[in-house]
Design a protein with these regions (language model features):
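Structured interface patches
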Residues: 1-170
Length: 170
């Protein structure tokens, strides 16, 4: 339940709980594939005149690839959500605030879920393991499976220094 009717606040804070499918249109353009549902829980409460504060959390699994060897990797993603929904447009200077129309009768929590998920998804790639060796730059073999047999690359910029080192040993 991520659409909350404002009349529900007559009974006090509103508990929110939802499970959104990974292919929900809300997550289009996210830049990551969701490998499971997005589970959202939280508590929405009135925080003054025409202001509502939502504190919650989300968790899901993102399917991505290792940035070194390109193996498929599943990464658990968890995030806390703190959002202020307000009809007072002077309070919108806070980056965690969301505007409500003055005539609004419900609060849509989905934009806050999307934004927090977008911020929580790893942007710079992940590793399949901390010591991932990646791919051979010559043949493309996965070096985690063992050596590829390619000759080590020689950096010709260091040949003069290697020759000098050889002369000093003699």
């Amino acid at each position: 339940m991520l659409l909350v009717d404002l009349r529900e606040f007559a009974r006090g804070p509103v508990e929110t709980r939802a499970e959104l499918a990974g292919d929900d249109p809300l997550f289009e353009g996210l830049g990551a594939a969701l490998a499971g549902p997005v589970r959202v829980t939280g508590r929405l409460q009135a925080a003054g005149e025409a202001r509502f504060y939502w504190r919650g959390s989300l968790d899901t699994i993102v399917a991505t690839e290792c940035r070194r060897c390109l193996r498929a990797v599943s990464v658990p993603v968890k995030a806390d959500i703190h959002a202020l929904f307000t009809k007072d447009h002077d309070a919108l200077e806070d980056p965690d605030s969301y505007p409500l129309a003055r005539e609004a009768t419900e609060i849509d929590l989905r934009p806050a879920v999307r934004e927090e998920l977008l911020l929580a998804v790893p942007q710079w790639g992940v590793l399949c393991q901390d010591d991932c060796r990646g791919l051979c730059p010559r043949c493309g073999r996965d070096l985690n499976a063992g050596p590829c047999g390619c000759a080590p690359a020689v950096d010709h910029r260091w040949q003069e220094l290697a020759a000098l080192k050889g002369k000093l040993r003699d």
